[in-house]
Amino acid sequence: MTTRLDDTFARCRAEGRAALVTYVMAGDPDPETSFAVLRALPAAGADIVEFGLPFTDPMADGPAIQAAGLRALKAGQSVARTLDLVRRFRAEDPRTPVILMGYYNPIYTYGVPRFLADAVAAGVDGLIVVDLPPEEDDELCLPARQAGLAFIRLATPTTDERRLPAVLANTSGFVYYVSITGITGAATPDFGAVASAVARIRAQTALPVVVGFGVKTGEHAAAIARNADGVVVGSALVDTLARSLDLEGRATSGSVAAVLALVRDLAAGVRSAAGGAA
């Protein structure tokens, strides 16, 4: 049986292009604004949605996503409320894949079996848990896959030929290649190095390879899309939302529109590279 992720990548391949994967933080700056952004992402051009689980100690994230998580937590966002937002989204949109991205602690605290059951029931398609290495697959990766969720791993510029097989072993859905060494939202990727890295990963897996970290504009997205199966954009969207907030950190009348305008630009960039994704 194919999954929403399988269908999405197949559809993008049929169109000769990469998928646009957009990341937003659940509950930022408040649940209703977050949901308004979430529900509008597909129409703006997002093929896959990553929804961040806010956490107090997001070690892999830069200042933009750290601040977004703190805003969400201040507004009362929790794992349960995040799953509620996914449930509401899924009631309106049966097609667009939703990936939850975050850290293990909130999931562990919620309870792994309960979390997996509730995530599946809400309509989640997969998980990215950045602080669980392959050596700890029994904790969440294998139970998640048994529950029917994709478990997406990160590969980085420092993932060498000895380490890559372990990273890929239980990965499903797609492989997420981190284009730079460091935290989210950092420098612009070296597009030539990204192309080489994607080719190296593709030599060892049939899974789609998507690339993220440092992608900020439609031009960046187009450059990545020529060599990858998908392009992830997160910090740029979170930054755009943050800049639209008032001095108290609350949403304004232009907040949702500002995020969607950038998504449309990114989607145009990805689609302008059609024919380049192989």
UniProtKB/Swiss-Prot annotation:
Reaction(s) this enzyme catalyzes, per UniProt: (1S,2R)-1-C-(indol-3-yl)glycerol 3-phosphate + L-serine = D-glyceraldehyde 3-phosphate + L-tryptophan + H2O
InterPro entries: Aldolase_TIM, RibuloseP-bd_barrel, Trp_synthase_suA
Top-level taxon: Bacteria
Active site feature: E50, D61
The enzyme's E.C. designation: 4.2.1.20
UniProt pathway: Amino-acid biosynthesis; L-tryptophan biosynthesis; L-tryptophan from chorismate: step 5/5
Keywords (A to Z) from UniProt: Amino-acid biosynthesis, Aromatic amino acid biosynthesis, Lyase, Tryptophan biosynthesis
GO CC terms in record: cytosol
Pfam family, one: Trp_syntA
MF GO annotations: tryptophan synthase activity
PANTHER family per the UniProt record, alphabetical: TRYPTOPHAN SYNTHASE ALPHA CHAIN, CHLOROPLASTIC, TRYPTOPHAN SYNTHASE, ALPHA CHAIN
Subunit note: Tetramer of two alpha and two beta chains.
Family, as annotated: Belongs to the TrpA family.
Function: The alpha subunit is responsible for the aldol cleavage of indoleglycerol phosphate to indole and glyceraldehyde 3-phosphate.
UniProt protein name: Tryptophan synthase alpha chain
Species for this entry: Methylobacterium nodulans (strain LMG 21967 / CNCM I-2342 / ORS 2060)
Underlying gene: trpA
